[in-house]
Amino acid sequence: MTAIAPVITIDGPSGAGKGTLCKAMAEALQWHLLDSGAIYRVLALAALHHHVDLASEDALVPLASHLDVRFVSTDGNLEVILEGEDVSGEIRTQEVANAASQVAAFPRVREALLRRQRAFREAPGLIADGRDMGTVVFPDAPVKIFLDASSEERAHRRMLQLQENGFSVNFERLLAEIKERDDRDRHRAVAPLVPAADALVLDSTRLSIEQVIEKALQYARQKLALA
């Protein structure tokens, strides 16, 4: 019987550093990577490319079931490959964001994408980045990490990121938005943002990203008995 490929799930709120951690771990272990937060945008873009009706659940389900997407991390940069093309920039447009909200509203589309995400589980292993990876998508994952940070620290990181890109931002407004999103995510009826019972909760508030990566890799290697 073929052994099931191991999965390391990295869940947590926006701004905790999940993306950076997942890319670093995928490169360090040479494992596959799943960015679940991008997958609805990728489906929306595929629908736009193929002129699929965004209001038709029946048309979207087969597209979601056979979505040709992969995520590649190289030197800390994540490439989103749809049907052989790098669409990392294209999925960040407002048109795609709006379309993603439409397709995510359909229950059968969500179910199809759940199965598609689980199909990323291939040897030698998978790093899964999201909000419900350890609780819903891969509840049997041998390594689960919930990466957290204070809302103030996450707002500060987001502010610096926006300022580096030339945007003027108000810290208090940013903090209020993050707190509102946290409250909504943690109290929603379906797949609330909570650590899995068997997850390591890693608070990155006072840690550098290098320290977070070191702690996460050490924990994963210990749990999986990796060299």
Curated annotation (Swiss-Prot):
InterPro entries: Cytidylate_kin, Cytidylate_kinase_dom, P-loop_NTPase. Keywords: ATP-binding, Cytoplasm, Kinase, Nucleotide-binding, Transferase. GO terms for molecular function: (d)CMP kinase activity; ATP binding; CMP kinase activity; dCMP kinase activity. The keyword Metal-binding does not apply. Signal peptide: none annotated. Pfam families: Cytidylate_kin (PF02224). One of its GO terms (biological process) is pyrimidine nucleotide metabolic process. It is found in: Cytoplasm. ATP binds at G12, P13, S14, G15, A16, G17, K18, G19, T20. The keyword Transferase applies. It catalyses: CMP + ATP = CDP + ADP; dCMP + ATP = dCDP + ADP. GO terms for cellular component: cytosol. Its EC number is 2.7.4.25. Belongs to the cytidylate kinase family. Type 1 subfamily. This is Cytidylate kinase. It comes from Salmonella typhimurium (strain LT2 / SGSC1412 / ATCC 700720).
